[in-house]
């Protein structure tokens, strides 16, 4: 699994891909003072002292277990939630340093799938040698009582609704789609929806830390995983060990500002793609200038809005919404640019299969028409963590010019996608605020200068907010930096994880 495809727009709206972004949630009660020591927080002793029963996962080298946590931390006697955990023990050589918890982002990304499919195999060997690599699927995600909302057919319809309404009828259709999505989540998963906040998951992580026998939590979080890690450090500063937050978010921003910033981030990523594309003899957007490339892409979107094209799936045609998602999916990693060029060329020949394949990968849709619960969990967490970016369609329409200014290519779609939480059945419990984690050990925040999903300025902001934050910069394209080929980045992070020595604040790598 590629971490660079896991962050989703806060709006998780129709077609407009992008990333999450939820600011720092304050939902749920904070632990009392006893949480800063080794004792369990009041009323939670049974959870902190349970025994994990490890078993074979059916995946070579990995063990799995089920951890119980209170469904409602405010009322721990009101029932449990079962959370899936997996680990791969340190390979050696060298002295074991404890556990390293990993999270790929989302929200809604399966940390266990990420661990088993990438982290425990692809993280630098010196790190895997000395840490047990561990993951927990957050509540509401994948193996941990997953949120469900729509059938596969319903989700197919949802992803094809026009995301850039041109008249009142289209606005009503889009609003109805958001409302149906929210109603489906309430119908199928209403009992868990109030209890999947980032604060809840951060508290689950502390229970797991205790059960693993670690005095402090060591952690690598990418994308939304940075928000989760920062939340943990804010709740449990004395228990925060070596934390790496790669591709960070600014938890002080409200949803509308986050979405607009992200819109600009994807515009910048497209400009990088276009600058590369026009140098290629086969660039389907022209070979003259990035401005012409942008004009040609917008014209393609307009044509697909008016007349969707065959996609290779007889039940789905490629319209503007799915095409936009396909393009944005390729913005996460420059390695996908050749695939995007081919897909765009195909669309110009009325073959939408390439862009549809990119969109399906983004949505985690399998060939049999089934969807993973990524997008459902994404909405559930985001809509609980922050108040809606917009409450009404009129509010969106007023904001469209600002979004268009941030991104002439994607702005309008991102603005309308930001409406979805207005229909959510559970009121948000979090609010944006500065995250300082006073008293925590040094925390390394990694930012990529042309990151589309988590703009670089967010990493700068989080590093400045954290009382012990250290900013490590990768000057490059794509989403996140660790393990992406920069020896400078990898060496700095490995040294921190293995020796506890953070890089110099402000260090820059290429």
Regions found by a protein language model. Give the residues of each.
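Structural motif
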Residues: 309-324, 332-336, 368-376
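Long, low-complexity segments enriched in small/aliphatic residues
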Residues: 353-386, 390-391, 396
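C-terminal motif of bacterial Sec signal peptides marking the signal peptidase cleavage site
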Residues: 20-23
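Bacterial signal peptide processing site
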Residues: 25-28
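Flexible "cap/lid" loop of the alpha/beta hydrolase fold
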Residues: 249-267, 343-345, 352-367
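Gly/Pro-rich cap/lid or specificity-loop segments adjacent to the active site
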Residues: 33-322, 380, 384-510
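Bacterial N-terminal signal peptides that target proteins for export
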Residues: 2-14
